[in-house]
Curated annotation (Swiss-Prot):
This is UPF0114 protein PP_0682. InterPro entries: UPF0114, UPF0114_bac. The keyword Transcription regulation does not apply. The chain crosses the membrane at residues 10-32, 53-75, 109-126, 135-157. It is found in: Cell membrane. Belongs to the UPF0114 family. One of its GO terms (cellular component) is plasma membrane. Keywords: Cell membrane, Membrane, Transmembrane, Transmembrane helix. PANTHER family: UPF0114 PROTEIN YQHA (PTHR38596:SF1). The keyword Glycosyltransferase does not apply. Coiled coil: none annotated. It is a multi-pass membrane protein.
Amino acid sequence: MERILENAMYASRWLLAPIYFGLSLGLLALALKFFQEVVHVLPNVFALSEADLILVILSLIDMSLVGGLLVMVMISGYENFVSQLDIDESKEKLNWLGKMDSSSLKMKVAASIVAISSIHLLRVFMDAQNISTDYLMWYVIIHMTFVVSAFCMGYLDKLTKH
């Protein structure tokens, strides 16, 4: 009975595979939104103010960071929890493939969240004259919460590895 239960639990890791595949569909949706934004802004690029153009570029950077985060979580999560990726040796391989454990993945995710939050904060500051000070204060508090959390996670990770 114990053996059957253990085998069933071990096999249940495959339930994560469709979830990671679903993330790839999320990446596709993000790419479509990215190119929709590019196609939308290009005809009007000369009519945009510098500040508006910077806001659009920040949105594109934000989407690229989220896309990178999706790829990282999707691939390393699959490798860590489901199965090793069998990639042909003749194909290009990501240098971190097979090297990112769940601890380093958490740190990369935390760093990505801080970077994404920084871009959102910069976007908010660029429109600061139209935003209430309470909103700005809470945005900074939330961002600093992400920063402190990422720092604490890194510090705890360093403590547990030594």
